[in-house]
């Protein structure tokens, strides 16, 4: 399976993402510069964390207009897996692949620590190797990770089982309904603020994030068999 790691000016988690896929997961991964216009040959797209375009205007607002974005939209429309982490999640909301928005943390401080997450939906291509209700430990590092949506959108997310991860015990940023990660209605686009790529090795704190990537590979292989 081959993963595309999209790089923007200001990305700083792209190397972490590449390392997670190549070295921990054992799959192919390549960088794709934001000015490219093709994702041919790739099976999954990863939008990493960082500060694309310096977070000017607002997080993800300028990345929305990058040349690669029409191809990311087409990729998602084809049903292929798209994962946006931290700034990548913010970008996914800006381009309309996911509802809602990410705003300033309610304490107005940058947060960098490992937090407990509850797996709210284990029936997605990203969470198939987790158990529903399982508590996992994944790092966060953000200043604008406070997920916001209106009441109608929140109800829809709940009704469609689109809330995939929630913060457990303590909500670090004020996100509505403790939301840490959501999928689109089709289930092939996941946005999350915590960093699974930073939880893929025991030596740096655990491997709870690795199963997310393993789940994607498992779902992809099953699709190839059934194709």
Curated annotation (Swiss-Prot):
GO cellular component, one term: cytoplasm
Reactions performed catalytically: N(2)-formyl-N(1)-(5-phospho-beta-D-ribosyl)glycinamide + L-glutamine + ATP + H2O = 2-formamido-N(1)-(5-O-phospho-beta-D-ribosyl)acetamidine + L-glutamate + ADP + phosphate + H(+); L-glutamine + H2O = L-glutamate + NH4(+)
UniProt keyword Ligase present: yes
Stored PANTHER family: PHOSPHORIBOSYLFORMYLGLYCINAMIDINE SYNTHASE SUBUNIT PURQ
GO terms (BP aspect): 'de novo' IMP biosynthetic process
Enzyme Commission designation: 6.3.5.3, 3.5.1.2
Pathway where this protein functions: Purine metabolism; IMP biosynthesis via de novo pathway; 5-amino-1-(5-phospho-D-ribosyl)imidazole from N(2)-formyl-N(1)-(5-phospho-D-ribosyl)glycinamide: step 1/2
Transmembrane segments: none
Subunit structure, interactors included: Part of the FGAM synthase complex composed of 1 PurL, 1 PurQ and 2 PurS subunits.
MF terms (GO), sorted A to Z: ATP binding; glutaminase activity; phosphoribosylformylglycinamidine synthase activity
Catalytic residues (positions): 86, 195, 197
Species lineage: Bacteria, Bacillati, Bacillota, Bacilli, Bacillales
UniProt entry keywords in alphabetical sequence: ATP-binding, Cytoplasm, Glutamine amidotransferase, Hydrolase, Ligase, Nucleotide-binding, Purine biosynthesis
Residue span(s) of domain Glutamine amidotransferase type-1: 2-226
Organism from which the protein derives: Listeria innocua serovar 6a (strain ATCC BAA-680 / CLIP 11262)
Function: Part of the phosphoribosylformylglycinamidine synthase complex involved in the purines biosynthetic pathway. Catalyzes the ATP-dependent conversion of formylglycinamide ribonucleotide (FGAR) and glutamine to yield formylglycinamidine ribonucleotide (FGAM) and glutamate. The FGAM synthase complex is composed of three subunits. PurQ produces an ammonia molecule by converting glutamine to glutamate. PurL transfers the ammonia molecule to FGAR to form FGAM in an ATP-dependent manner.
InterPro entries reported in the protein's UniProt record: Class_I_gatase-like (IPR029062), PRibForGlyAmidine_synth_PurQ (IPR010075)
Subcellular location: Cytoplasm
Full protein name: Phosphoribosylformylglycinamidine synthase subunit PurQ
